[in-house]
């Protein structure tokens, strides 16, 4: 999402780079911040691809580091992704004359509090509840009078209410039991479902579920 002149990527789902390439910017290199709500595999499936592609397509001799904001253990995960791409990094440096060093990444780990200052406008005001994964965090991105909350997966909790209070929109993952019927016993453990979305915050004005492409649910 874009806030002012800043472009944020929240979670690295499968296919996120293809979606970014199809957008108006056509490249993930313009992403100024990568925000990670938690370390479930589906949230970081394309993280390694993002690290390499962002690095290669910046086309600069001295590119700034890519900031990644996430929960504890994010730095370890990023390091593992880079290690897995070690041979490719060597190949890319050999092939591209403008690449002199491996990808530069700065990882910031938080569970609550304010992160950055204008024009960044990113705040983490508390953890969310997506057990058994812990900790998980939500992001509130603000630009001028507009604020959008992106929380990943969670169930209603006090910190989510606080994070989403008076926000213009809540972007949130939900699970639909009719789609994942074979694992329905697990569907209500750590995830919202469509009838419960609006319980996340009485003050939020919109929530969009994006867990299953083509099956989005919009709850006013």
UniProtKB/Swiss-Prot annotation:
Gene3D superfamilies given in the database record: Ribonuclease Z/Hydroxyacylglutathione hydrolase-like
Residues the record lists as binding Zn(2+) 2: 42, 215
Catalytic activity: Endonucleolytic cleavage of RNA, removing extra 3' nucleotides from tRNA precursor, generating 3' termini of tRNAs. A 3'-hydroxy group is left at the tRNA terminus and a 5'-phosphoryl group is left at the trailer molecule
Protein name: Putative ribonuclease Z
Protein purpose: Zinc phosphodiesterase, which displays some tRNA 3'-processing endonuclease activity. Probably involved in tRNA maturation, by removing a 3'-trailer from precursor tRNA.
Record bears the keyword Metal-binding: yes
Cofactor binding remark: Binds 2 Zn(2+) ions.
Positions annotated as active site in the UniProt record: 42 (proton acceptor)
Cofactor: Zn(2+)
Positions that bind Zn(2+) 1: 38, 40, 130
Pfam families: Lactamase_B_2 (PF12706)
Gene Ontology terms, MF aspect: 3'-tRNA processing endoribonuclease activity; metal ion binding
Cysteine pairings via disulfide bonds: none
InterPro entries cross-referenced by the UniProt entry: Metallo-B-lactamas, RibonucZ/Hydroxyglut_hydro
UniProt EC number: 3.1.26.11
Family per record: Belongs to the RNase Z family.
Subunit structure as annotated in this protein's UniProt entry: Homodimer.
Region (Disordered) residue spans: 193-220
Keywords associated with the record: Endonuclease, Hydrolase, Metal-binding, Nuclease, tRNA processing, Zinc
């Amino acid at each position: 999402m874009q806030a002012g002149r800043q472009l944020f990527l929240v979670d690295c789902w499968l296919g996120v780079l293809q979606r970014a390439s199809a957008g108006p910017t056509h490249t993930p290199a313009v992403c100024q911040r990568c925000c990670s709500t938690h370390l479930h595999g589906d949230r970081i499936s394309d993280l390694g691809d993002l690290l390499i592609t962002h690095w290669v397509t910046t086309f600069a001799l001295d590119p700034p580091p890519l900031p990644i904001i996430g929960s504890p253990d994010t730095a370890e995960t990023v390091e593992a992704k880079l290690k897995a791409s070690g041979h490719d990094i060597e190949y890319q440096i050999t092939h591209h004359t403008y690449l002199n060093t491996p990808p530069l990444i700065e990882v910031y780990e938080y569970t609550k509090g304010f992160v950055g200052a204008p024009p960044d406008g990113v705040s983490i005001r508390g953890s969310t509840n997506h057990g058994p994964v812990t900790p998980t965090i939500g992001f509130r991105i603000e630009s001028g009078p507009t604020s959008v909350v992106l929380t990943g997966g969670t169930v209603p909790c006090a910190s989510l209410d606080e994070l989403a209070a008076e926000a213009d929109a809540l972007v949130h993952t939900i699970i639909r039991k009719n789609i994942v019927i074979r694992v329905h016993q697990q569907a209500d453990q750590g995830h919202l479902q469509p009838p419960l979305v609006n319980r996340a915050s009485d003050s939020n004005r919109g929530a969009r579920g994006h867990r299953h492409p083509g099956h989005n649910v919009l709850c006013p």
